[in-house]
Amino acid sequence: MLKLSMNTESLPSLNDKTLGWLTFLHRKVSINDDWSEDGEPLDWWDKTSNPPVLNFARFDLSESSYALGLMADVTPAWREVYAFILKGLSERHLTFWAAYDWLTQIGPDPNRGKYPQEWIDLWIPDHLVGKYDTPGWVANGIEPWGLQKDPIGADGNLFFKGWLNLIQSLHVYTTGEDTWGSSFQVAGVDRSKFDWTQHRLVEHLSSQWTKNRMGPHCENTKIWPYCLSAAGLGLQLYDAIFQKNTHSVYPEWVEHTKDKYYGFDSSGALEWTPIYYDPLIDHIHAAGPSNGLTIAFYMMPQDPIFAEFLYRTAVKKLGWDNINKEIKMKPEPRFMALGLACAKEFGDTTVEMRLRAFAEEHFEPRWFGENNINFGYWFNLNEKWPRGQWAALAMMAEVGKSGAWSNLFRNPNLEKFNAPSLEGVDFPNILVEQAFNDPNSQTLHIKLKVANKSKENSPSKIFIKKIPDLSAVKVKRDGYLYDMWKATGKSSIEIDISYSDMKLEIYTGWSGAKKRGEFNKVIKKDNLTSIGAGIMQRPQSLKIINTSSCPCCSSIGN
């Protein structure tokens, strides 16, 4: 039999670590744990990292969603598992435990006078020690807002509604279906329930942002540029999918607040970056320039010029670009993982390679689970499961190429919804490394890998849907013509396969619609914010922290 040549090495594919992480996320959402008032999330959901600000299970939901969006762009012809996981993440984000802080932290923190000195130094304005709530305490019910039972409808709680929309938008990006356009219920205070749709949520969020030019707040009284930049990503992807224009609030907000939220010297060099802003007391809580790295990660698809400025300044301060300077572990890995993701995104090969080598040595990458099918980063914590939030961020550097994160939001692939797609894979027994339609050759390229060796060589089947012309279909397996398939409808076929590693080429006749999302237009510089532009009145109160333990910042003197 003549073997036909096939070169798929240049096509995008998922590496082993990514597939191992994907199987673990699939495992996490496949178990129906109880996130209601009467239950508790299973302990593999991370509600431990970075107290008092991020030690809530919903941040595991949001951080776990990012790499799935990237995976959907690597294998756009196979998305069923990403959709399943993102649906599970979205559903959990509507529950009591997702909104735990807003539903239980009522009024001022009764322990505000007992904070450890470390928290005081890190989080509290100097003139309000003992009289001010730490970040992480939402203070639902305080004036001027009063008790607001709805975690979405509230004036505050930006970090809840902003990340919820981002996860839901990523879910829709994998399915092409307006799932969250139908009414869903979100848990409220005292077991109340509130009906929302994603479209109403976005309208509410963008309206709040328009009315408050400094930005909606997270905890009552505290506005976080970090969280607002994540919320902006959700609006950006939502607009691209639904052809809306809600994201315009983000560049306007950056331009309006830049000279209040960031400190520049007379030469325009960055001196400090914001952690949070309290408009009631006009107080900026800030850190050194390297803190800007955490904002840059979320900002770069939205304002790449200023985001890269923040990134380059942080890298310079940290010495990561100096091959003669040793990279040292920060107090926790979140900052390092974000740095690695940013370095890859900006194509900073020197920093990427240095941080990647550092992660391999210090993040404790490990395979686990039955047949070692799962992968995660364990961070030498000696815990039962990989630390969810940190591991999810560390995985960002494993998926896609340089620029993939920005491309997901600025140039989303919407033509995939009308292209031939692979479905019915027995995941996780069979893993999909590659599923990509090449419009030039009009061929769907698939690469499968058997994960469950106990099923090896036993029969299975897969389905190819949305084929434009069944009469033109030809199938090759590992380079040879293959006839173990049949039509199952006007635009679909069923292929008999086995539990074994294989490459499939399916000629479908699909040449591509050659249409991308609304954001495929070139982002002009006059649509982006400039560095150090404009003058805004400085805050009445400013505290620049100097610490080695900030969960979103870096080390002393940076």
Language-model features: locations:
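Extended ligand-binding groove/face enriched in aromatic
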Residues: 76-222, 229, 268-271
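Predominantly extracellular/luminal regions of secreted and cell-surface proteins
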Residues: 524-547
